[in-house]
Each structure stands twice: as structure tokens, then as C-alpha cells.
Amino acid sequence: MRLRFTIPAAALSLLGAAVAIPTVHANGPPPGHTGGFGEPTCLECHVGNDLNAFGGRVAVLGLPKTYERGRRYSLTVVLEAEETTSAGFQLSVRYGGGAQWGDPAGVLVPVDQRVSVTRAETGQLYANQTLQGSPSTDPDLATWALEWVAPSVGGPVAIHVAANSANGDDSPLSDLVYAADVTIPPARR
């Protein structure tokens, strides 16, 4: 009789574990998954492939070679990956050197309902997709628009972005994750 109750209890335990596994972050990942400054990427949850595998890429368009303090820049995060049915990203901009190393560098501003900006408990700003921004914009392509207001205090800034190309099975398995970073110095005064 005891065995009869043990099997259903074990099955319930497995069911509970399966429900606890995160399936998707369609409304944006938890803060701190850009791959920069010691952070993990989306690979922390989306497993099964290596980072930057299979010829896809993530890039941030609209970044200047040098930034002017206080200037507003229109940016586009672009994810190119085969078989993308839904996608997500996270981006941060921080000081990449000096006394402010790792501190937020400027302000991130969403320009539509496809992107939101979150301030983490650490004070760091993160831009990411919203639920409306999760569907891919074209076959094998996802894009998100935002603005960056450069900081008023000079110093090199580091932009880190990670993006996830989801395969549409509503699980964290076999999705493709890409990451990129760029450092931009301030313009000379």
C-alpha cells in the first residue's frame, strides 16, 4: 500500500519541477543578462547551443564612433538568426573605465511599446523587449528601437547586448543566443 502512494507523490514532484522551469521571458529577461561586467547572457536559461553559434548575430546600429556629451542617439538592436519566430534582447550602457567604471552611462529611452527600460536594484538601466516586442519583425530577423542619451560626464562607455532567437517551442531548449559589445570614447572637447 505504501508503494501505491509513493509513485503518485514522485510523479507530482516531477510535475512540480517541470512547472518551475522557466519557459520564456516574453516580457523581458530579468535584469543583468547582457554578458557585460561579469553578467551572464540569456544562456543562463536558454540552453542547448553555444553563444554566437550558427552564423547569426546581434548588433546595435546607430552608435557613433565617439559620443557627444548629452546628445540623444537613435539606436536599433538587430538580431539576425535562422528560424527566429520570437526573440528578445537586453542592452546596457555603462562607463567602461575610470572612477565611474560599471556605473550607468547616460539614459536609455524606449520609443515604442516594443521596448521597455528597467532600473535594477543596483541602479543599472537595462533596455529589453516587451511582450509586444517578442514576435520577430521578419523571417530570421528581429529589431528593436530605442534612444540613448549620452552622459554629461565624459569617459569611455561600454555597450553590452545579448539577444535570444527563440525556436517557437515555448521552452528554454535549443534557442540561439548571441552577444556583442562595443566601447565608445567621448568626443574631444
Could you say what each language-model-derived stretch is?
Residues 5, 17-188:
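Sequence context surrounding c-type heme c attachment/ligation sites in exported
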Residues 1-11:
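Bacterial N-terminal signal peptides that target proteins for export
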